[in-house]
From Swiss-Prot:
Catalyzes the rearrangement of 1-deoxy-D-xylulose 5-phosphate (DXP) to produce the thiazole phosphate moiety of thiamine. Sulfur is provided by the thiocarboxylate moiety of the carrier protein ThiS. In vitro, sulfur can be provided by H(2)S. HAMAP family: ThiG. It is found in: Cytoplasm. GO terms for biological process: thiamine diphosphate biosynthetic process. This is Thiazole synthase. The active site is at 96 (schiff-base intermediate with dxp). It comes from Clostridioides difficile (strain 630). The gene is thiG.
Amino acid sequence: MDKLVLGGHEFNSRLLVGTGKYGSNNILPEVIKESGSEIITMALRRVDLDNKQENILTYIPKEMTILPNTSGATNAEEAVRIARISRKMGCGDFIKIEVISDTRYLLPDNEETIKATKILADEGFIVLPYMTPDLYAGRRLIEANAAAVMPLGAPIGSNRGLQMKEMIRIMIDELDIPIIVDAGIGKPSQAMEAMEMGADAVLVNTAIASAGDPVQMARAFKLAVEGGREAYIAKTGNVSEFANASSPLTGFLGNL
């Protein structure tokens, strides 16, 4: 069976979801259910063990794999510190590295991300680094023992789609590591396109959370990701510059 494998762990769903920007946390369980997702990311600052109502973990089903992120880190040192706190709080070994010092476009700092990835991978973390699409940075993250790489499709929260499509395509073609397209995906059709290209998974948050009906949108993304993966495995037909008839154009009337 076709499974997503991250750090030796197998997952049936190739859709990862987030926890931010929802009007109410109460909708999260239903969103997660309809998405079919098995991995959910969250900022560590949203975990409040002393306040059940404010603790995001209260709303996440126990069977989900938690992917804490280092949101708020502006350099490798801060990201490493957040990851270690996450482990001490019982959030497990998965960690999504986010190192962002740019406050306007929120673009990840690849150099600091590589540094943090190496340190945390050496400590036994299953590291999924969020990155600006770049082949050379991707290779260095592999050398740093990342479990996957997470190139952005467009600036985070923008819903602009796959603006970095060609750079992501190069990474898919050249890197022997799971590629999870993260950030910028605004429509199910864009998630499907990423999967048709050969991405191993996508992470979607804003597009679901900001939808008129987040629950229905979660299901739409589930179906899109599944359809895109099926199309990639089936291998789409060749693109032709000219028309090609699907039925013979000659000989029929002459035989009557």
